[in-house]
Amino acid sequence: MNVKTEPDRSRDVSQPLDKLGPDETLKANSDYLRGTIKQSLADEITAAVTANDAKLMKFFGIYQQDDRDIRDERRRQKLEAAFSFMVRVRLPGGVCSPSQWLKLDALGRAYGGDTLRLTTRQTFQLHRIMKHNMRAVIQGLRDVLLDTRAACGDDTRGVMCTVNPDLSKLHAEVYALAKQASDHAVHRTGAYQEIWYEAERQDTDGPEEPFYGRTYMPRKFKIGFAIPPSNDIDVYGQDLGFIAIARRGKLKGFNVAIGGGLGRTDQSPKTYPRLATVIGYIDADKLFPTIDAVMSVQRDYGDRLDRLHARFKYTIDEKGLDWIKAEAERRLGFALEPAQPYTFTSNGDPLGWVKGEDGREHCTLFIQNGRVINTPDHPMMDGLRAIAQVHKGMFRITPNQNLIISDIAPEDRPAIAALMKQYGLDQFETRSGLRLNSMACVALPTCGLAMAESERYLPDLVTKIEAILNVHGLKDDPITIRMTGCPNGCSRPYIAEIGLTGRAPGKYNLYLGGGFHGERLNKMYLENVGEGAILEALDKTLGHYARDRKPGEHFGDFAIRAGYVVEVKEGRFFND
């Protein structure tokens, strides 16, 4: 191997704080994330918290936001912005009980604008929480054994796990490890209990953060567990991905993939999405040492000067994959074994009913863009509450923002199915293949980074694309389409067959050629265009696809074969 022996350390944690970015000083001087958050919460003059406290609160799963629909009007009236907060739950693998669902439903109705949001990382978000209500929300979550620690911030984000109920035993094994991984990697500071539960500070015998230290990670770090043949979690988009390898239906171990990440900045060509690289295999009992070793390499060598360059993918491409692997193995004390064979067939959700190995049944419901809300013609939130009141199994959020009513005894299926029909929750049976494989981030009006609409616009755009699909006989074909309101990639648009990222109000970059299994990045086809140009381009390319595709060929593969875009073989060539 061509391994670099002396990597550049001028931008990592080995340097004095005054040589690094301001966020590193903020973290180091925050008293393990305490900052002045208590004082900010007590300040009744403003609905906001201080800028520094807003950054620290991300480590507790909380984002300060404002209603951008009325921002200009409030400015004209010389009022402060209409501040509120988004609260994200830590929910490894997306699994919650009926009692937890009912609590979240109640909190959403009382404090979150009568809605819940299912996310692309298998958890819940509550939006429009007022500052004076945040403790009530977080303490309400505690009542059902949920918290929001590390759902945002420079730490290990929510741990993902394939939702594969038809492989019940294997899923149970992998999910148990994913849940343990979430607990293993979460930060240890007592600040969360002191601020949100109003607990007394406890003395500690050792370091308050034995793994993270005072400055935590350089940037977010994402971990996910995939169970082939499903790649629903988009394992190649994770900083650290584990691909389950089974023998005779029992978990044997994991292939290890490192360096995935999909965020980028349009104005910064040095930023790009990258798919994770599989570097080897470990037995299941080596999982937690491997997590520690890989994370510690990024903790120690990640860029802490430039946050646009701070994700693990850039550390790998700068230091070299061979060096990163060798350093992780040095810390592990053993070499990874060669990767084991595996096959992915899809990164979508099989909607409808399936029966698991244990005889229990599961039904996957289509939740458009993850938005759980009542509308005059579709009382979805009421319907899911009614199911939670009688359901004896679990709820499982998928990485595609859908919802599985899981672990249903055969004798209970008729009652659950009747509620689904009563509340219109079975409408997935009439949806197009494109809509069922669509995904959008929240974007406007609450996300401060959004430059264009996403969740509020994609359903209407899909309706217009469906008219094109009908003309070309493609209505039922599964084609992935994903939209974000900015280039940061929260709905993973850069691995969709059709990707759209916001540039300005009504303007988007259009990407084509992503892999249907999540195994290939797409490539920009049109830049900064409006709806008319998007529909014209899709009419052309989808029509060509309908006429000339090969048997079993997916649209993303065709877009490359037909020459609409070139294949992106490595993330660092994405912007070429």
Curated annotation (Swiss-Prot):
Keyword NADP: yes
GO CC terms: sulfite reductase complex (NADPH)
Organism: Nitrobacter hamburgensis (strain DSM 10229 / NCIMB 13809 / X14)
The UniProt record lists the keyword Ribonucleoprotein: no
Binding site for siroheme: 490
Protein name: Sulfite reductase [NADPH] hemoprotein beta-component
InterPro entries to which the protein is assigned, alphabetical: CysI, NiRdtase/SiRdtase_haem-b_fer, Nit/Sulf_reduc_fer-like_dom_sf, NO2/SO3_Rdtase_4Fe4S_dom, NO2/SO3_Rdtase_4Fe4S_prot, NO2/SO3_Rdtase_4Fe4S_sf, NO2/SO3_Rdtase_FeS/sirohaem_BS
Keywords, sorted A to Z: 4Fe-4S, Amino-acid biosynthesis, Cysteine biosynthesis, Heme, Iron, Iron-sulfur, Metal-binding, NADP, Oxidoreductase
